[in-house]
Regions:
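Catalytic-core regions of core metabolic enzymes
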Residues: 1-499
Length: 499
C-alpha cells in the first residue's frame, strides 16, 4: 500500500478524505447492467464522466459491465483500491465491509440506506460498520448518501448524472436529493464546483471533518452547507469559525419548524437542537445563514466570482427610474447606504444625458440609447472612493427585447430590410458581450464588485465567465436578489474586519 504522505497528503481524517476525493482506483460494489439501479447509474456516471483513473465493477455474477470485466469479490481485483462506492443491500453490508477491510481499501462511499434513519436495528448495523471501518483505518462516507462529485479529479460518483464544471464552490449536503438538484441548477447558472459530498447519516465523517479538509483544499474558495442536524456542535462551531475567516461558509439549516424536524428525522435519522441556538452559534462564528436553497446558489455565485466589498456604500446605475427607486429602498432596508454623488461625477454623466436626468444616486440613464453611457457611469462610481460596490440595473437583457421587436417587425412590415433587422440583433448582442467583458476588466482594476440585474430573463446563467480574468460578472433576475447578495457580502466583510 502506498504512503499518503508520498502523494502530498498529511495524516488524519483530512488526509483520508483527500485520498477519497482524488482517487487513482475506484471499485463500484453492487455494479449492475439494469438501467435505473444504483449500481448501474453510478458506474455509468463514472465512466461517462471520463474518470482518468481505473474503474473496477464488482458484482456477484461476474461477466462484463459497460465493457469492463466485472469481479465477483473486491479481493479478486489485483490492484490497490483507493475508493469503493457501495450500493449493495443493507443486509449484505457486513460481509462487503469486511471484504473491503481485508482488501485494504482506503475508503468507502456507502450509498445504501436502511440504517439509523430506519430505526434501532439500522442504527446498530450502522455502528457496527463504523467499528469495522475504524479498526482497519478505513474511512466511510454515509451511509444513505447520493454520492460524491469531484470535478477537478474527473470523478462523478453519484446516481444523478449532473457533471458540473470545475470551480471553487464546495457543497456538503446531508440531503443527497436536495444537493444534486442544487448542483444541477448551479451548473446551469455557470457556478463551478470544486466538490460535492452527500454526507448522508454522517456515521463516521461529519460536517466538521469536511470543513477541515476544505480549509486546505486549493480548489475551494467558498463553502455551502445544507444541514439537518449537527454532531458535536462545539467542534462544528470551532472549526467553522476558523475556516470561515479565509473561506466564506453559507449554511441552510433544514428542520427549523416542527414539520421539518419530523421529516428530516425519517430522512437522515437527524436529531435536532434548538433552531435559535443554532442561529446564534452561526452568527457568533460569522457564518452566513440563509432560509432558502435559492440563496445558497445566489450567494455562492457572488462569493466565487466577485471581489469582496470593503464597506456598505452603494452606487446604483439604472436604465430607468422605477428600478432605481425600488433598489434604493431595499438597500436602505438592508443597511446599505446610497451616498450623494459629487459634482465632478454629475458633470461627467451630465455631458452624456439630457438636462432632465436625476443628477443623483441612483443614476437614472433615462432609457438612453447611447451605449457608452452605462460604461461611463459604472466606472465613475468605481473610481470614486465614496462607494464600495455598484448595482447595475437593466443594461444587459435589452438584447432579448430587441429580438422580440425584430420578430414583430418581420411579421408586420415587409418594407423593412431583413439585413437591417439582422444588424440590429447582431449589434445588441455584441454590445452586451462587450459590456460583460468590460465589467470584468473594471472589477479587476478597481477591486470593487459590480452586481447586475438583467432586464429580461436570459438562458446564459447567473455567472458570465471571462477567460483569464480574476473576477466574473454576475446577473440576477431581480433587484431584491442583487441587494440581498450585496448585503450578505458586506456582512461577511464586517465579520472578517472584526475577527
Amino acid at each position: 500500500m502506498d504512503n499518503l504522505q508520498d502523494r502530498g497528503f498529511s495524516t488524519g481524517t483530512a488526509a483520508s478524505l483527500a485520498c477519497l476525493f482524488n482517487p487513482r482506483t475506484v471499485a463500484v460494489i453492487g455494479a449492475s447492467s439494469v438501467i435505473g439501479k444504483w449500481g448501474q447509474m453510478i458506474l455509468s456516471n463514472i465512466l461517462a464522466g471520463r474518470f482518468p483513473g481505473k474503474t473496477f465493477p464488482v458484482n456477484s455474477g461476474g461477466g462484463t459491465l459497460c465493457g469492463l470485466n466485472s469481479y465477483r469479490r473486491i479481493q479478486d481485483v489485483t490492484e490497490p483500491i483507493d475508493l469503493a462506492v457501495i450500493t449493495a443491500p443493507a443486509g449484505a453490508l457486513r460481509e462487503v465491509v469486511n471484504e473491503c477491510c481485508e482488501k485494504g481499501v482506503r475508503g468507502m462511499v456507502v450509498i445504501t440506506s436502511g440504517f439509523s434513519e430506519a430505526g434501532e436495528e439500522g442504527r446498530r448495523l450502522e455502528e457496527e460498520l463504523v467499528s469495522l471501518s475504524r479498526a482497519s483505518q478505513m474511512i466511510m462516507i454515509g451511509p444513505n448518501t447520493m454520492g460524491i462529485l469531484c470535478p477537478h479529479a474527473g470523478l462523478f460518483a453519484s446516481g444523478a448524472h449532473s457533471r458540473p464544471g470545475k470551480g471553487t464552490v464546495a457543497f456538503v449536503s446531508q440531503s443527497g436529493n436536495l444537493g444534486t438538484q442544487l448542483i444541477h441548477w448551479a451548473d446551469q447558472q455557470g457556478i463551478g464546483i470544486s466538490l460535492f459530498v452527500g454526507s448522508g447519516n454522517e456515521a463516521m465523517v461529519t460536517c466538521s471533518d469536511y470543513l477541515e479538509y476544505l480549509e486546505s483544499d486549493p480548489h475551494t474558495g467558498t463553502i455551502i452547507l445544507y444541514m439537518e442536524s449537527v454532531k458535536d456542535g462545539r467542534r462544528f462551531i470551532e472549526v467553522s469559525r476558523r475556516v470561515n475567516r479565509s473561506k466564506p461558509i453559507i449554511v441552510l439549516k433544514g428542520g427549523r419548524t416542527e414539520a421539518g424536524k419530523g421529516a428530516s428525522a425519517s430522512h437522515t435519522g437527524a436529531m435536532h437542537g434548538e433552531t435559535a441556538v443554532f442561529g446564534a452559534a452561526c452568527r457568533q462564528a460569522g457564518l452566513i445563514e440563509v432560509s432558502a436553497p435559492s440563496e445558497l446558489l445566489d450567494l455562492s455565485a457572488a462569493f466565487s466570482s466577485l471581489p469582496l466589498p470593503r464597506g456598505n456604500r452603494v452606487g446604483i446605475v439604472t436604465l430607468g427610474g422605477g428600478w432605481g427607486v425600488v433598489t434604493a429602498d431595499q438597500c436602505n432596508e438592508k443597511g446599505l447606504l446610497i451616498p450623494d454623488i459629487p459634482d465632478n461625477i454629475v458633470r461627467t454623466i451630465g455631458s452624456f444625458l439630457p438636462p432632465f436626468w436625476s443628477r443623483r444616486n441612483p443614476i437614472d440613464l433615462v432609457g438612453t440609447k447611447d451605449l457608452q453611457v452605462p460604461l461611463v457611469a459604472v466606472e465613475e462610481f468605481l473610481k470614486w472612493d465614496g462607494v464600495d460596490a455598484v448595482i447595475s440595473l437593466g443594461i444587459v437583457g435589452r438584447h432579448e427585447l430587441v429580438q422580440l421587436l425584430v420578430q414583430s417587425v418581420r411579421e408586420v412590415d415587409p418594407d423593412v430590410s431583413s439585413s437591417h433587422l439582422s444588424q440590429l440583433e447582431s449589434a445588441s448582442r455584441e454590445y452586451e458581450k462587450a459590456y460583460v467583458a468590460r465589467m470584468a476588466d473594471l472589477m479587476a482594476e478597481y477591486r470593487k464588485p459590480v452586481i447586475s440585474v438583467s432586464l429580461a430573463r436570459t438562458q446564459e446563467g447567473t455567472v458570465r465567465h471571462q477567460q483569464g480574468k480574476p473576477y466574473h460578472p454576475v446577473f440576477y433576475q431581480t433587484p431584491e436578489d442583487a441587494v440581498n447578495v450585496l448585503a450578505r457580502m458586506v456582512q461577511y466583510h464586517e465579520y472578517k474586519a472584526r475577527s
